[in-house]
Amino acid sequence: SEDGQAVVEENGYISQGNTGAFKSTEAEGKIVVAGSSSVTPVMEKLKEAYLAINPNATIEVQQSDSTTGMTSAMEGMCDIGMASRELKGSELAAGLTPTVIAMDGIAVVVNHNNTVDNLTSEQVKEIFTGKLTDWSAAQ
């Protein structure tokens, strides 16, 4: 919702644009949200905003990691899974539907003594997958 995206932006994430105004249905009951530790801070803020207009609802946010969140959603242990990555093919095949609520920036930093000063996204990927194992190959 527009309100949710405002919360996303206020907390330093990149919003996904205006998705319209949220209209409270005065929901009741409990929702369990589980997963990514990097999504948890913004989810806690979204929880606060939601509960401010739906005081009879209960939201439990369980912090772990993306895979645990997706597994918990697939197994019915939580209502909403949080992931800070794209869903895997197996997760999509299991029926999970992704909804992007925000994007976060990731920075790669090298020691100031390192002569490498301009890495491409592909080179970073190759470093972390082990394809590039020597800095000289990244220059």
Predicted regions and their residues:
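Flexible loop/hinge segments at secondary-structure junctions
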Residues: 1-139
